[in-house]
Amino acid sequence: MKIYVDFDDCLCETARSFADLAIEMFGKRVPYEKIRFFELNKSFELNDEEYDRFMQKGHEPDVLLSYKETPGASDVINEWLASGHDVSVITGRPYSAFEPSRKWLDDHGMKDVRLYCLNKYGRDSFIYNSDFSLELEDYYKMKFDLAVEDSPKAFKFFSHLPDLKVMVFDRPWNREVEFPNGNYIRCIDWQMIRKYVAEHSV
């Protein structure tokens, strides 16, 4: 199987860290379960200037390296690799975040996973002149059998793969979303994802 895995809020608990950061920077307390929007400026009620500062801080190397692993992520990823599956981590983080992101993967036992920074969300506004290691035209040439993703904003990047099975990692901001089709399956944790792959691997 060729497997696509998103980084933030699939491999690590990014939103929980941003909730702590919102308290630290702006005194805004939004419990994790109340983060109803993928757009963090809406969830934390930030103006444009605050949002830019917030995202810049959240992408500093020491902050990225501090994100906690989502339970079970590295174990399942390494099981897949050991079983011969081809795993690519494709993140919407800018390329300026590549090195700390790569180090985070390595530090959490995922040294053999490929990492790509794809311009998923047009986030150049908060890190000026940022580059991405994977352009959309090249991404669309890639083929996957299964994807692990939490963001409804990313679902459009799967439309070129009609047979793709998408494991939607359950998060507060995707619970009210209507899935595009029956290939999208809500998963509450990595054990559920592991079970699905084990049962459907050829």
What are these regions (language model features)?
Residues 1-51:
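Active-site neighborhood of HAD-like aspartate-dependent phosphohydrolases
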